[in-house]
Amino acid sequence: GAMAPRLAYRFWRRLHWLLALAVALGLAHLLVLGLDAFLLWVPLLALLLLAWRVLGADRGWSALPYVVEAVQRMGDDGIEARLRPLTRGLAARPGQFVLVAFFRGPHFRGCAEFHPFTLSDVAADGRITLGIKALGDCTRHLQALEPGVAVRVQGPFGRFLDEAEKEPGLWIAGGIGITPFLARLRQGALTVPVRLVYLYRAAEAAYAAELDGLAA
């Protein structure tokens, strides 16, 4: 909505937590009023899903430990960060996204809350690369990211490109939205003809130069 760009991510999340609290209170109210036994599983299932959301996703119980291995400047307001797994890596595919929490470093403030980022590269050894543009409070802090920072990663999620090569296609991207397509192109030759239309500003020309090389 029109208000979304004006809300800090932390405040936006707290608003959603208030909604979750309202749902929990509503379920508790139904239990107090009394439910038929065969309907009792409905609020119980909802509470279990809410607990999984809190513990598994928001608190990172399902997250894997990574470390920032390299950071590359991509124009005036973007970076690419390569992350190396400390245990097992994610079984990710191009077109997917992950939830990432960046912790503090010697000269880096950190963004300990989990934020979504689309993968811009996926390596066979478990390393993943994220394209990060300064669009909000956390992503602005991440422009100062440095190697060695501890990271927690959840996912991967999504099936954006799973059926993209079943027939010839047209891919359209703008700015940092190129990352899922770039992740696929970095894997090697496509299996079907695809036309890519990429709209970008001069500050994002670093990706355009690489795309020219991949298309050659």
Predicted regions and their residues:
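Ferredoxin-reductase
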Residues: 58-152, 193-195, 199-202, 212
